[in-house]
Design a protein with these regions (language model features):
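Conserved Walker-type P-loop NTP-binding/catalytic site
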Residues: 13-90, 140-148, 157-167, 204, ...
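Alpha-helical solenoid repeat scaffolds, predominantly canonical TPR units
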Residues: 353, 373, 380, 409, ...
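Short secondary-structure boundary elements
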Residues: 18, 155-157, 161-372, 376-381
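Tandem amphipathic alpha-helical repeat scaffolds
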Residues: 125, 298, 336, 356-363, ...
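A short hydrophobic beta-strand->loop->alpha-helix junction that borders the nucleotide-binding pocket
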Residues: 1-9, 125-126, 154-155
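Conserved P-loop NTPase "ATPase switch" module shared by AAA+ and STAND
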Residues: 80-103, 120
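Sensor-1/coupling segment of RecA-like P-loop NTPase cores
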Residues: 106-153
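Structural signature of alpha-solenoid helical repeat junctions
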Residues: 326-333, 346-349, 369, 387-396, ...
Length: 446
């Protein structure tokens, strides 16, 4: 299933939407209907494109938040288990440490339901990115207590493996002293080994007795040297792309790089592709991604906060133009960029897309993500007079909190929803006041 977007840059369940949506697009409608059964209408809440395959689906009846999420998860679990009966399925989840909370909850649910199925889940994550407070720690802890997964700790390459890697990947035969240094300096980390071998193969590291002093001390140093070999124009384009995210579309980059012609931009992308900095996501899809997340992070870290803010502003405006009438379906992505651009653009667009993204997250039972989105927008409006937007954000935040199982959070839900209710009453907006009073989260705070 490949890499996912950075957590706050994409919609909840993004990796599942991509992977299950891709699988669904390749299936016959009759097969889908059979594998999904009555759960098809529930899965359509997660994968809207399913209704194009199965146009006769009805809407799911409304439920309280927790039963509704269980119904969705159970429907996905049943579908994948049934689909794996005709042919075994392996789902590979890369970079789990970037997943949103809702995606990890779905992963945990599926892991519990895999018994007696032909479904295998395999995931990778960077352990140094996962603190005790990280959502993935909670997921792994729960699965470990129930003995539902096997952890395979990946150690570094041995000296012999480093030698073989250098020869196979770059045709470099490392002498013993060089091999020993490279192995010690990298601790066998394949990414770091790859970067140093690249430098060796390009003559970056001299063969004289002092060559060892030029070997990079860290992976970011090695990545920096690879970027230094690219033209300044290529680095400028890559920096813009890095602020977009790990993946980016060619049409967006064209909008953001108007000082280059199309041919010039393609030549610069070819330069980055040949250097192994970028790779095409799919041939012909005009979508690219950085070969490793650390390359993207290195580029972003090298520019000032002020420049990042202005790039996010340009990206948000360009995305609005590119998405056109479908802009609301990409609300989470736009909310992310306009949140980063708030110091120069203000809160208007941040609030607009946060309201849409929050409602979409609530509709997908991703309450944790909805809570984050609403809260972020409210924080940006702090100090401003309460208005319709603030009340709508408070209502959304309250519904997100009311869906949580934590009592303290539900108490906060009451306070936020009451604040929204009082504003609408004072403003004479009876319709919105009634909507709050009649919402299915009303019993949680009344």
């Amino acid at each position: 299933m490949g890499p996912v977007l950075r957590r706050r840059g994409g919609a909840p369940y993004w990796r599942w939407i991509q992977s299950i949506g891709s699988f669904i697009s390749e299936q016959d409608p009759d097969q889908l209907s059979s594998a999904m059964g009555p759960g098809a209408s529930h899965i359509a809440e997660l994968i809207p494109g399913l209704r194009e395959k199965l146009p006769d689906l009805t809407d799911s009846p409304a439920l309280e938040p927790e039963p509704a999420r269980f119904r969705l998860f159970d429907s996905v679990n049943t579908f994948l288990k049934n689909a794996s009966q005709s042919q075994p399925l392996i789902i590979v989840l890369d970079d789990l440490h970037w997943d949103d909370h809702a995606s990890l909850l779905l992963l945990e649910f599926l892991a519990r339901g895999m018994a007696a199925s032909n479904l295998l889940l395999a995931g990778t994550y960077c352990d140094v990115e996962v603190s005790r407070q990280h959502p993935l720690s909670q997921t792994l802890g729960s699965l470990m207590r129930e003995q539902l997964f096997r952890r395979i700790q990946l150690g570094g390459l041995t000296q012999q493996e480093v030698s073989e890697f250098a020869e196979l990947s770059a045709g470099v035969a490392l002498p013993d002293n060089a091999l020993d240094l490279v192995h010690r300096r990298t601790e066998g980390n394949p990414l770091f080994v790859n970067e140093i071998v690249r430098l060796l193969s390009q003559g970056e590291v001299a063969t004289d007795p002092g060559w060892a002093a030029t070997v990079p001390e860290g992976i970011r140093d090695a990545i920096g040297r690879r970027l230094n070999r690219l033209s300044s124009e290529c680095n400028r384009v890559l920096t813009t792309a890095a602020v977009v995210g790990r993946q980016f579309n060619l049409d967006l980059l064209e909008e953001l790089s108007s000082d280059f012609s199309e041919d010039q931009l393609l030549e610069l992308l070819d330069e980055a592709l040949k250097a192994g900095v970028l790779e095409e996501v799919r041939m012909g899809a005009e979508r690219f991604q950085f070969q490793h997340a650390l390359i993207q992070e290195t580029l972003v870290s090298e520019i000032s906060a002020a420049r990042q803010v202005r790039l996010h502003a340009r990206i948000g405006v360009a995305l609005e133009e590119l998405y056109g009438a479908e802009v609301e379906t990409h609300a989470a992505e736009l909310a992310h960029h306009f949140a980063e651009a708030e110091p120069v653009l203000g809160t208007e667009k941040l609030v607009r897309y946060s309201l849409a993204a929050g409602e979409q997250a609530l509709a997908a039972y991703a309450w944790e993500e909805a809570l984050f989105v609403f809260d972020r927008a409210l924080a940006a409006k702090e100090g401003q007079p309460v208005d319709d937007d603030s009340a709508a954000l408070l209502f959304g935040l309250g519904r997100s909190q009311a869906a949580m199982l934590d009592n303290q959070t539900r108490i906060e839900a009451y306070s936020n929803m009451k604040s929204a209710f009082d504003f609408y009453v004072d403003a004479g907006n009876v319709e919105q006041a009634v909507a709050i009073a009649c919402s299915n989260t009303f019993p949680a705070w009344h």
